[in-house]
């Protein structure tokens, strides 16, 4: 009986712990999931591929901030799937940008 009470106490404590913060410091500019990588890209081809992409130089907090940070380098704010070697496949315009 005591075992079940203690086990229930530990289970309740485990459930009450907050979830791990998995944010990347970039606010809600990109949707969670596939398109979760904020990138400042020089060019967007066919609305799908970002060329000469870089991670924003500072944390961004909303779409307007993301647009302004990317505009400093003449780039477009995009949310991409797989940024590799300065190229990003499957990009979409950032939320609110």
From Swiss-Prot:
Keywords, comma-separated and alphabetical: Cell wall, Disulfide bond, Secreted, Signal
InterPro entries cross-referenced by the UniProt entry: Cerato-ulmin_hydrophobin, Hydrophobin_sf
Propeptide residues according to the Swiss-Prot or TrEMBL record: 17-22
Compartmental location: Secreted, Cell wall; Secreted
Matching CDD domains: hydrophobin_II (cd23508)
Superkingdom assignment: Eukaryota
Chief location of this protein within or outside the cell: secreted
Span of the signal peptide: 1-16
Description of the deletion phenotype: Leads to wettable and fluffy colonies. Results in thinner hyphae and impairs the formation of aerial hyphae.
Presence of the UniProt keyword Glycoprotein in the record: no
Positions of disulphide bridges: 30-79, 40-70, 41-53, 80-91
SUPFAM superfamilies linked to this entry: Hydrophobin II, HfbII (SSF101751)
Pfam families (UniProt xref): Hydrophobin_2
Gene Ontology CC terms: extracellular region
Summary of subunit composition and partner proteins: Homotetramer. Further self-assembles to form highly ordered films at water-air interfaces through intermolecular interactions.
Family recorded in the similarity comment: Belongs to the cerato-ulmin hydrophobin family.
Record function comment: Aerial growth, conidiation, and dispersal of filamentous fungi in the environment rely upon a capability of their secreting small amphipathic proteins called hydrophobins (HPBs) with low sequence identity. Class I can self-assemble into an outermost layer of rodlet bundles on aerial cell surfaces, conferring cellular hydrophobicity that supports fungal growth, development and dispersal; whereas Class II form highly ordered films at water-air interfaces through intermolecular interactions but contribute nothing to the rodlet structure.
Protein name: Class II hydrophobin 1
Source organism of this protein record: Hypocrea jecorina
Lineage summary: Eukaryota, Fungi, Dikarya, Ascomycota, Pezizomycotina
Chain's gene name: hfb1
């Amino acid at each position: 009986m005591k075992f079940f009470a203690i086990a229930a106490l530990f289970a309740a404590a485990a459930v009450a712990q907050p979830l791990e913060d998995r944010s990347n410091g970039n606010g809600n500019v990109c949707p969670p999931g596939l398109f979760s990588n904020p990138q400042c890209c020089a060019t967007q081809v066919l609305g799908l591929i970002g060329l000469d992409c870089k991670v924003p130089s500072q944390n961004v907090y909303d779409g307007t901030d993301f647009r302004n940070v990317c505009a400093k380098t003449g780039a477009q704010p995009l949310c991409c799937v797989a940024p590799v070697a300065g190229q990003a496949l499957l990009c979409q315009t950032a939320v609110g940008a």
